[in-house]
């Protein structure tokens, strides 16, 4: 009999399996798709030779993840590549704010009135970032905090809405860039603890950057898989699980699935009926015949580029999908240009580029024209560079990854208490009413992103139970 069976070979499922295998527990992973990866895949979606990431592409949380940093993934082929700038945010007047590795360069891009407030905000936490990241990404605490004082101070700043934190800034550049950071997890700007979201992304950039993985995000999943196999673990693909009886006998079952799917597989009825799914996105992957023709200079060397004219426009774009069930007329866009840092992603002289905007959960429209109008505001002539595009709305995203219910790439609404306490209000979020079944997906803390911490934290709960039985 196996000690543990993991369902789902995304970053969290693979990390959970690795953590258990490292401690000597026989483990096997079962994945419905033909390849491993979940939200960390790479495919040729447009033209031959253009390697696209269907979901996550830039990895500020991955390179800063305590889980990944504790594993020898570089030995198995993972290499982080850094663009000239982690992130840039252009404005209609041709200027831009930047999120640089340098706090000083970032602060200077906001202008004289906001440079000092930004420095003071960041420099309170950056020297203790590694400890803070471990404590924050282990909430609800799976162990005593290593630095409770810094964590408490961070909570005082981060738990209020991001709109409160943005009052520290007087001008629009700092406010707009920070609003865009919050929007990376599709959280409403006025929501509980959204200040913490923006701070985490900013601190992550200053600490270690916002890199891409050489060859694509698939490299992360492949490195985890190779390490797991070296530890004696097994991975089975093309294996759909509809109920626990489909799996071999094991002492523990660890599911990297949505709460809805877990309840169905484990026979838990309506246990997660109150779990809320959030807005979706409409995503476009592009093959380009040259770099994006940004008007501002800074985005040309940035790995990630945020598109929103000001914080008001961003707030409206976030409100429309969740508050009105309409797609925004001027969507806020998160864009990534991996080939700026990794020329292996496209043929010589060509580029890959992706962008997404927010839409209602389950929306079935086409946001292509609205998104490209936004891009043309900041990169005139963009459409002329397009060789091919591959679009994916909520239905296509959910078909690619069953955890994206209704196209929600955050695997659950990132708002209210569900931002921190998910999938239920509990100090033991990885446990379920079934004593042998655990959940390790992004529907558990610390939430969405390719960081493996949900799997890492869940593995702790699993091995504690295995040692007791």
Swiss-Prot record:
Mind telling me which PANTHER family this protein's record contains? DEHYDROGENASE-RELATED (PTHR10668:SF105), PHYTOENE DEHYDROGENASE (PTHR10668)
Supply the name of the protein. Answer: Protein p49
> What is the protein's species of origin?
Streptomyces lividans
Write the lineage as a comma-separated list. Bacteria, Bacillati, Actinomycetota, Actinomycetes, Kitasatosporales
């Amino acid at each position: 009999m196996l000690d543990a069976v993991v369902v789902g070979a995304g970053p969290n499922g693979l990390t959970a399996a690795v953590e258990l295998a490292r401690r000597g527990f026989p483990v096997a992973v079962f994945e419905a798709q033909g390849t491993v990866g979940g939200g960390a895949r790479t495919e040729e979606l447009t033209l031959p030779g253009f390697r696209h990431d269907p979901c996550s592409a830039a990895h500020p949380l991955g390179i800063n993840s305590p889980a990944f940093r504790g594993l020898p993934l570089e030995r198995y082929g993972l290499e982080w590549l850094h663009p000239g700038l982690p992130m840039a945010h252009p404005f209609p007047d041709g200027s831009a704010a930047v999120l640089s590795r340098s706090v000083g360069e970032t602060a200077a891009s906001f202008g004289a009135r906001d440079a000092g407030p930004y420095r003071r905000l960041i420099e309170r936490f950056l020297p203790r970032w590694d400890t803070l990241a471990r404590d924050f990404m282990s909430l609800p605490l799976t162990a005593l905090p290593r630095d409770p004082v810094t964590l408490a101070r961070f909570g005082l700043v981060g738990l209020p809405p991001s709109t409160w934190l943005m009052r520290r800034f007087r001008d629009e550049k700092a406010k707009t860039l920070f609003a865009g950071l919050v929007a990376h997890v599709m959280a409403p700007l006025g929501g509980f603890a959204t200040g913490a979201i923006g701070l985490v992304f900013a601190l992550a950039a200053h600490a270690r950057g916002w890199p891409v993985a050489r060859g694509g995000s698939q490299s992360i999943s492949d490195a985890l898989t190779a390490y797991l196999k070296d530890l004696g673990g097994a991975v089975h693909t093309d294996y759909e699980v509809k109920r626990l009886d489909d799996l071999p006998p094991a002492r523990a079952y660890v599911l990297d699935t949505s709460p809805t799917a877990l309840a169905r597989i484990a026979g838990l009825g309506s246990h997660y009926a109150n779990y809320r799914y959030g807005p979706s996105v409409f995503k476009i992957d592009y093959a380009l015949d040259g770099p994006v023709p940004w008007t501002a200079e800074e985005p040309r060397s940035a790995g990630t580029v945020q598109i929103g004219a000001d914080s008001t426009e961003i707030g409206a774009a976030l409100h429309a999908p969740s508050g009105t069930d309409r797609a925004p007329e001027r969507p806020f866009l998160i864009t990534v240009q991996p080939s700026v840092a990794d020329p292996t992603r496209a043929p010589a002289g060509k580029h890959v580029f992706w962008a997404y905007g927010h839409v209602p959960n389950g929306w079935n429209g086409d946001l292509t024209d609205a998104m490209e109008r936004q891009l043309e505001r900041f990169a005139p002539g963009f459409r002329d560079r397009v060789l091919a595009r591959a679009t994916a709305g909520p239905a296509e995203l959910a078909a690619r990854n069953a955890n994206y219910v209704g196209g929600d790439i955050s695997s659950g609404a990132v708002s209210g208490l569900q931002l921190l306490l998910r999938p239920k209000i509990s100090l033991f979020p990885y446990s379920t009413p079934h004593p042998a079944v655990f959940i390790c997906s992004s529907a558990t803390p610390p939430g969405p992103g390719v960081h493996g911490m949900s799997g890492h934290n869940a593995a702790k709960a699993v091995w504690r139970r295995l040692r007791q039985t």
